[in-house]
């Protein structure tokens, strides 16, 4: 790798090394502010244009880690002359939705403060910007898409309506060639062969379901002949691999056995061959086939439904596996939602009219977020370390900003932050509630956006998505090609473009570990991997997959933005590792109980890693504090 990203990008990520600060925890409380500049407009604070290590970036987690890992926090706080009707911890979708629901119910003059530990708002719903020759290029920094929004709750739908989000326009605005939104669009499988990566023939999603020319597709892969024949038989659907079981035994099997066990024990595939079906499983469940049940794997689009006989009909009926879901995309992922919310809450953040029609290209003035004359104030780079109810019925909230320890007061407080930090913020919580919160482990994720000079090499693949199950990043695709919000995606292969790489940390699994144990291990991998290592992985993978089509990583890559989320998706209960609790007794339900003037609003509290759960939790928390 003879050419690397600039030292500015490198230093933005490498300094954390193993994820533990080089300073002692107490030294963190004396740090100076981190400088963030817009490369297009020097000396302007504009985080979306930063490249290098983003997501859980340097400065966003050290204070919280000191609190959670060693119990250290400031001994004294400066009491600010600020009182609010509501203090919200976290300015992601749940936090911003909380502010919106509260303002709608209590009036536009309600005083609200949002505190967030990151240098940008949006939580996981961040956007990455690139600029080339006056053109704006957008990428997804975290939260990806709206999933089946027609099935949202009435409150979640009402929020989208309040923001002016037109779902019909979103459907019409995106290219039909974008495989993440349209599985009929061409997508391919790429796996290593003896002479480099081989890209299989045919639509890989269709091949997995036994559609199209399965034999030609599978025969094009660099696999042993014996494995090829097993795959062709498996995908053809002509054999019932559970024919030795009764119908009841089959149903028990698909719920209690791992997908990997089915592929290796029933179908007879070897370990390496089985992994070719794991890309989407990893992206949805953040573990591979060893740690999801057969029925869960099928729900993620993995093959096998056509090869289990009569139980497939029951699965279709009970699991609702028929393709009724819908994925809608903004050009910057779900970052559009918090941007629209911020514009509603703090109108002065943009000049002139900013709405659904032009939100994608609107410039936000971050200096306007935390002005005293705002009824809603959004304070970034502020890590909350404590929240407790005072004797007078108010709530004091302690936080650290740029090394300074501050205290503000509110009539109410809603915690819209990572669930796992809450027992440390509120040590007075009942033990049962703390245990409920601690049960879950957020799933780690790593998403990268790669700014390319042009799309010539990628266009020669003839597909918008490449599954790479044996590489560091499971999927290579393109930034959403949609005109929603005024965005203009690339029109020809000669235009600059953004590649979107999605992955989860590859943690060795024997199948005996629970998904929660693997998430913990994966989180350590994400924190301990330097930007330099990620950069090398990205360059090597892109060169291996695209090199035969004329790609040269040394000259074609202009910038890399690596969005690491060690605390990524909210934990969702699994068939293999979690019991079925009675209503109201699941850990997330116990953990989200109202605690006097303090409520909890986040997707963790819904045990569901989607935009609508963040919105629903916000509405619930506001109702708790205002009813």
How does the language model describe each region?
Residues 42-49, 122-154, 299-320:
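Glycine-rich active-site loop/strand segments that organize a redox cofactor
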Residues 374-376, 380-510:
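Mid-domain catalytic core of redox enzymes
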Residues 236-382:
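Active-site/ligand-binding neighborhood in enzyme catalytic cores
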Residues 85-100, 115-118, 380, 384, ...:
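Conserved beta-strand->loop/alpha-helix structural units within folded catalytic cores of enzymes
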Residues 34-75, 129, 192-195, 400, ...:
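Conserved flavin/dinucleotide-binding core of flavoenzymes
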């Amino acid at each position: 790798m003879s050419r690397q990203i600039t030292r500015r990008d490198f230093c933005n990520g490498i300094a954390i090394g193993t994820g533990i600060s080089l300073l002692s925890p107490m030294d963190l409380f004396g740090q100076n502010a981190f400088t963030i500049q817009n490369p297009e407009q020097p000396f302007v604070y504009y985080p979306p244009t930063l490249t290098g290590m983003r997501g859980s970036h340097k400065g966003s987690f050290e204070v919280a880690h000191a609190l959670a890992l060693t119990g250290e926090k400031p001994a004294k706080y400066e009491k600010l002359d600020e009182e609010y009707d509501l203090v919200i911890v976290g300015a992601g979708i749940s936090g911003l939705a909380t502010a919106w629901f509260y303002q709608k119910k209590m009036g536009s003059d309600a005083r609200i403060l949002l505190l967030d530990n990151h240098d940008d708002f949006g939580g996981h719903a961040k956007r990455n910007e690139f600029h080339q020759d006056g053109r704006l290029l957008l990428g997804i920094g975290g939260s990806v898409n709206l999933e089946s929004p027609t099935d949202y709750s009435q409150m979640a739908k009402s929020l989208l309506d309040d923001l002016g989000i037109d779902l019909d326009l979103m459907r019409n605005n995106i290219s039909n060639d974008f495989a993440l939104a349209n599985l009929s669009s061409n997508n391919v499988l790429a796996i290593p062969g003896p002479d480099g990566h081989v890209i299989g023939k045919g639509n890989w999603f269709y091949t997995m379901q036994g559609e199209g020319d399965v034999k030609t597709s599978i025969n094009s892969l660099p696999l042993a002949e014996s494995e090829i024949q097993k795959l062709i038989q498996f995908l053809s659907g002509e054999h019932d691999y559970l024919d030795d079981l009764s119908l009841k035994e089959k149903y028990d099997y698909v719920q209690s056995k791992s997908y990997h066990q089915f592929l290796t024990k029933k179908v007879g595939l070897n370990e390496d061959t089985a992994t070719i079906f794991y890309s989407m499983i990893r992206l949805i469940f953040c573990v591979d086939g060893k740690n999801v049940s057969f029925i869960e794997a099928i729900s993620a689009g993995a093959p096998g439904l056509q090869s289990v006989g009569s139980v497939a009909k029951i699965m279709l009926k009970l699991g609702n596996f028929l393709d009724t879901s819908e994925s809608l995309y903004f050009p910057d992922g779900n970052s559009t939602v918090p941007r629209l919310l911020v514009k509603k809450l703090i109108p002065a953040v943009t000049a002139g009219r900013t709405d659904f029609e032009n939100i994608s290209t609107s410039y936000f003035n971050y200096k306007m977020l935390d002005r005293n004359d705002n009824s809603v104030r959004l304070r970034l780079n502020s890590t909350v370390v404590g929240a407790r109810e005072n004797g007078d019925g108010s709530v004091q909230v302690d936080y650290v900003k740029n090394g300074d320890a501050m205290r503000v007061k509110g009539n109410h407080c809603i915690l819209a932050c990572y669930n796992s930090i809450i027992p440390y913020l509120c040590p007075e919580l009942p033990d049962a509630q703390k245990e409920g919160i601690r049960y879950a482990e957020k799933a780690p994720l790593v998403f990268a956006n790669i700014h390319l000079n042009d799309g010539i090499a990628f266009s020669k693949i003839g597909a918008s998505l490449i599954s790479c199950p044996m590489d560091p990043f499971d999927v290579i695709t393109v930034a959403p090609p949609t005109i929603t919000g005024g965005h203009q995606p690339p029109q020809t292969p000669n235009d600059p473009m953004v590649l979107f790489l999605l992955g989860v940390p590859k943690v060795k699994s024997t199948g005996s570990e629970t998904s929660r144990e693997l998430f913990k291990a994966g989180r350590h991998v994400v924190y301990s991997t330097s930007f330099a290592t990620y950069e090398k992985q990205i360059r090597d993978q892109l060169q291996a997959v695209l090199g035969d089509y004329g790609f040269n990583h040394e000259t074609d890559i202009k910038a890399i933005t690596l969005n690491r989320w060690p605390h990524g998706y909210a934990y969702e209960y699994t068939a293999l590792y979690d019991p079925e609790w009675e209503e109201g007794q699941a850990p997330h339900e116990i953990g989200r109980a109202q605690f006097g003037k303090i409520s909890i609003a986040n997707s963790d509290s819904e045990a569901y890693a989607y935009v609508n759960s963040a919105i629903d939790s916000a509405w619930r928390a506001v109702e708790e504090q205002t009813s």
